Structures are given as structure tokens and as C-alpha cells.
């Protein structure tokens, strides 16, 4: 949960509720190098989303691709984002230049793991699944975040209200489940 974040689109300022999803990467890159840190831990990659379930929302599109089927209206109403914790997927990652000119790896697509790969066996996850909610912050988890992520959360009106600085906006209600059948897809 990143709280409500200010962004600009087509010259207009917007304030939208944002979330971040992260994935632990397993496997090798295009050159055959293991996807690990210098310590040998799996690399991780993250993608920020607007918390929106509209038909064109990137969050909904990626989740539907991950499930390999669209959500019904009923599934969308009861979808709980936490049901994806620990669910395996395949990612399409592309290089993209940042505003500072540096190249970054961005998640372009999410897909289910093909059954032939599942049947061969998936590696065990190394890092624990974690959820951070501004409404009920885990301060120990918050302290593990990098400076940039902390600053982003701290600038949200929800965090400001929690710290007694400003009034929080009305909360955006997220629907609940739809990944209950993730293992079967």
C-alpha cells in the first residue's frame, strides 16, 4: 500500500491510490546468468499500480493475464489482492530508460506458469511474503524499505493522517477474491 499518490498525465494532476506488487525472480537471464544478488539471494522486481479494477486498469489486466482468464463481475467484487501472495507466475521484463537516463528493468507482462514447467517442479521461495498496509502499518517492515519507498509512503495523505499531520482522503474500497483457483489455471 503506497497510499494516495500525486501523478501527472497529459498535463493534468491526479491523485490516485497506488499499490506495489513484488516478485522474487528465479532462473537465468538471456546470457545464462543466474538471477541472484551478490549474496546469492534471488533478485526481486516490483511494479506500481493504480488501485483500480476498471477494464483498462493495468492491475486488472495483469491479474487477468496471470489467471489466464477474465474476471466475472462477481469475482471482481469479491477479489482479495492477498490471494496472489505466493502464487507463481511468469514475467515479461523489458529494459526502459528512466528520467535520469539510466536503464531500468520493468515488468511489462504477467502470465501463468505453464503446466509443463509446474510439473517439472518450481523452486522454493526464499523470501517471506509480506503485506504493508498504511491503515495498520507494520513499522518493523516499514524500516526495511529503501529511502525512496519510505519517502513515497510518507508523502501520502493516509500516512500524514496516521502521523497526525493532515486529514486522510476517503478510502478507496477494494473488492475481494478471484485467485482462489490460481493453482488450477
Stretches found by the model and what they are:
Residues 1-185:
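Short beta-rich binding modules
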Amino acid at each position: 500500500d503506497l497510499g494516495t499518490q500525486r501523478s501527472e498525465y497529459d498535463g493534468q494532476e491526479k491523485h490516485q491510490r497506488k499499490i506495489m506488487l513484488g516478485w522474487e525472480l528465479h532462473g537465468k537471464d538471456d546470457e545464462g546468468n543466474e538471477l541472484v544478488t551478490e549474496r546469492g539471494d534471488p533478485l526481486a522486481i516490483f511494479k506500481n499500480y493504480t488501485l483500480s479494477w476498471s477494464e483498462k486498469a493495468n492491475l486488472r489486466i495483469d491479474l487477468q493475464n496471470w489467471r489466464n482468464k477474465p474476471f466475472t463481475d462477481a469475482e471482481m467484487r469479491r477479489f482479495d489482492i492477498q490471494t496472489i501472495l505466493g502464487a507463481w507466475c511468469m514475467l515479461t521484463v523489458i529494459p526502459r530508460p528512466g528520467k535520469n537516463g539510466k536503464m531500468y528493468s520493468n515488468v511489462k507482462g504477467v502470465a501463468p506458469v505453464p503446466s509443463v514447467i509446474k510439473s517439472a517442479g518450481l523452486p522454493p521461495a526464499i523470501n517471506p511474503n509480506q503485506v504493508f498496509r498504511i491503515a495498520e502499518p507494520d513499522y518493523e517492515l516499514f524500516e526495511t524499505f529503501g529511502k525512496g519507498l519510505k519517502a513515497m509512503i510518507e508523502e501520502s495523505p493516509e500516512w500524514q493522517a496516521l502521523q497526525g499531520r493532515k486529514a486522510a482522503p476517503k478510502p478507496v474500497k477494494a473488492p475481494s477474491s478471484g485467485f482462489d483457483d490460481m493453482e488450477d489455471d
